[in-house]
C-alpha cells in the first residue's frame, strides 16, 4: 500500500469527527492468521468507502457492525456500495467474491460500484460465472434473494480519475508497484 495513501487517510480521519478510518487488513500473500489481506475502509458521514478487498474483508467489516457486536450501523455489510481497487494482486483482491455475494445475501439491493484498474472487470465476470449456480439457487430457491444486489457497476480507473460525492473526493494516480501498474488513490 502506498504510504502517501495511508498518510492521507490519517489526515482525513482527524479532519472531522464524522470521518473514520478502519484498517481491515495489512497482510501480504503469506497466510498469516493474525493479519487479513490488504483492505481499508473510510467511513465519511456514515457512508462506507472500501479500498482494496483482501482475504477476510467482509468478516472484518462485519466485526464493526451491531449485528456482530460492533458499534457502527453503517458497517452492516449490506451497506457497502463503493469499492476501490488500487491494483490486481491477490492480497488486494481475494475477498472480491465475498464482497459481491455476502452483502447481497445479507440484503443489499443496489449493485456494488467498483472502481479499479484494467482487468478488474474481467475478475468480476469470472466470479459471477463461477457462482452462477449459487446465484440462481438464491434467486429462485426456497428463500429467494433480490435479483439486483449481486450485480456490479464497474468503472475503470485511469490516471487522474476522480470520484467525488457529497462526502469524499478520490483521485487516482499512476505508479509502478513490483513491476505492475497500480493506481494509488488520494482522498
Residue ranges and their predicted role:
Residues 1-8:
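Sec-dependent signal peptide recognition
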Residues 45-48, 55-115:
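Active-site metal-binding motif and surrounding structural segment of the metallo-beta-lactamase
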Residues 35-37, 109, 149:
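Extracytoplasmic
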Residues 117-175:
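Metallo-beta-lactamase
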Residues 176-187:
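Single conserved hydrophobic/aromatic residue that forms the stacking wall/gate
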Residues 30-32, 106, 179:
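Short glycine/serine/proline-enriched coil/turn segments at secondary-structure junctions
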Residues 21-23, 111-115, 123-126:
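Non-globular, low-confidence helical/coil segments that flank catalytic cores
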Residues 10-50, 57, 161-173:
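Zn-dependent metallo-beta-lactamase
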Amino acid at each position: 500500500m502506498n504510504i502517501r495513501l495511508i498518510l492521507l487517510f490519517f489526515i482525513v480521519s482527524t479532519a472531522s469527527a464524522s470521518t473514520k478510518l478502519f484498517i481491515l487488513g495489512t497482510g501480504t500473500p503469506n497466510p498469516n492468521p493474525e493479519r487479513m489481506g490488504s483492505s481499508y475502509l473510510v467511513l465519511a458521514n456514515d457512508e462506507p468507502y472500501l479500498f482494496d478487498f483482501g482475504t477476510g474483508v467482509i468478516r472484518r467489516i462485519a466485526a464493526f457492525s451491531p449485528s456482530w457486536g460492533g458499534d457502527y450501523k453503517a458497517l452492516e455489510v449490506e451497506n457497502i456500495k463503493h469499492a476501490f481497487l488500487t491494483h490486481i494482486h491477490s492480497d488486494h483482491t481475494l475477498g472480491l467474491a465475498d464482497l459481491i455475494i455476502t452483502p447481497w445475501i445479507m440484503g443489499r439491493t443496489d449493485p456494488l460500484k467498483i472502481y479499479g484498474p484494467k482487468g478488474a472487470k474481467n475478475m468480476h465476470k469470472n466470479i459471477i460465472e463461477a457462482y452462477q449456480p449459487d446465484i440462481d439457487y438464491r434467486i429462485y430457491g426456497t428463500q429467494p434473494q433480490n435479483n439486483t444486489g449481486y450485480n456490479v457497476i464497474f468503472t475503470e480507473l485511469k490516471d487522474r480519475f476522480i470520484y467525488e460525492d457529497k462526502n469524499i473526493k478520490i483521485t487516482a494516480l499512476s505508479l509502478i508497484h513490483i513491476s505492475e501498474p497500480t493506481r494509488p488513490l488520494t482522498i
